Amino acid sequence: MSKLWGGRFTEEAEAWVEEFGASISFDKQLVSQDIKGSIAHVTMLAKQGIVTKEEAEKIKIGLQYLLEEAKQNKLNFSVEAEDIHLNIEKMLIERIGEVGGKLHTGRSRNDQVATDMHLYLKEKVEDIIKATKQLQTVLVHQAENNIETIMPGYTHLQRAQPISFAHHILAYFWMLERDVNRYEDSLKRINISPLGAGALAGTTFPIDREYSAELLGFNGIYENSLDAVSDRDFILEFLSNSSMLMMHLSRFCEELILWSSQEFQFIEMSDQYATGSSIMPQKKNPDMAELIRGKTGRVYGNLFSLLTVMKGLPLAYNKDLQEDKEGMFDTVKTVEGCLHIMAGMIETMTVNKEKMGQAVTQDFSNATEIADYLASKGLPFRQAHEIVGKLVLHCTQKGIYLLDVPLETYKEMSPLFEEDLYEVLSPYAAVKRRNSAGGTGFEQIEKALEKAKGLAIEFVGI
């Protein structure tokens, strides 16, 4: 077939070369954005008198038809037409005649594809924000049900201090809230229009870029045409934000995997989110959590891939930029899928409160409570720390825990110890007392939950 740009050429490329250079296999995902951008563009052309109202109306009717066909997956794309832009233009001309060729007046594929991707990411980022808010709501529900569920808190994967399971869950709520904030902030930079920048230098036609931007729901336009067609910062920022979100999901999944193991038994995954073994009949594997953890590397790879593409590109457009889309599409699909799986997995998991409670009575995570007890009676904390360290050593040598140590032994270590010490050693009491702002104390958790509910419910409307 003859190319829409073929006037300069005397030879046709081999089929395998065309296939290598074509992007229609993946950029067809931009079909609705491409058509909507074209409708706005031709509307502006008519307003400015660059095409007649009759021509614009005919073009818009043709584009609306193609948009409806696209929604029903009835469009047949061809490699020969290279990309989504030329495929749509070719179909339009075939449907309405040569007047369809006027659509591209005052526009280049360079600003056209940039516009498509801005429209695409604007929609997808809003979808991801909503899905993240839905996951946050699930976290709030689990936290509400586990305010007084006591578990070990960890540092270095060693039991450190008793905490509320709700407090642990809410830590991920606030990580996700930062992710939401980053996505929301990125919309400022996504929601600007490159349309009308042309190939790189603008156009000689008297276009109205602000008008077409307004028609597409953009808040403004790029101030520099070179920047407009070569900028991919908005995609990189999306990939970076998504990498951080996936990192948070991966960290949580790592804990879910550990907690569901026989060594911990803190939770049990629903059968819906686990699989078995082809050889070992007893196995219940946390495959969905493992997949989310694994897919995090995939999103990181998409970020570093585009950073590497961009690092050596001179202004303005280069064909290298064709490599900006597949990683973007893949990241959107991956993040959306992981968020939905994560929400279902957490919502349906069973919390083994008894096992968590046993864990904090069979360790030394209450040692800090004794040090604080001595410090509250006027002993310098460093001296208190030394005394408690010796107590822990004594216990490990005897094969007992701090609650098992008789008061006489405590008094041998320090005369400040009294009978009320044993109240301090209770994991429940230890958690309750940590009532500083942002701490694991029950009053603080109630406050945190109220704030978290407002942030989650405000968006998803429950």
UniProtKB/Swiss-Prot annotation:
NCBIfam families: argH. It catalyses: 2-(N(omega)-L-arginino)succinate = fumarate + L-arginine. It comes from the Bacteria. It is found in: Cytoplasm. One of its GO terms (cellular component) is cytosol. GO terms for molecular function: argininosuccinate lyase activity. SUPFAM superfamilies: L-aspartase-like. One of its GO terms (biological process) is L-arginine biosynthetic process. Its EC number is 4.3.2.1. This is Argininosuccinate lyase. Belongs to the lyase 1 family. Argininosuccinate lyase subfamily. Gene3D superfamilies: Fumarase/aspartase (C-terminal domain), Fumarase/aspartase (Central domain), Fumarase/aspartase (N-terminal domain). Disulfide bonds: none annotated. HAMAP family: Arg_succ_lyase. Keywords: Amino-acid biosynthesis, Arginine biosynthesis, Cytoplasm, Lyase. Pathway: Amino-acid biosynthesis; L-arginine biosynthesis; L-arginine from L-ornithine and carbamoyl phosphate: step 3/3.
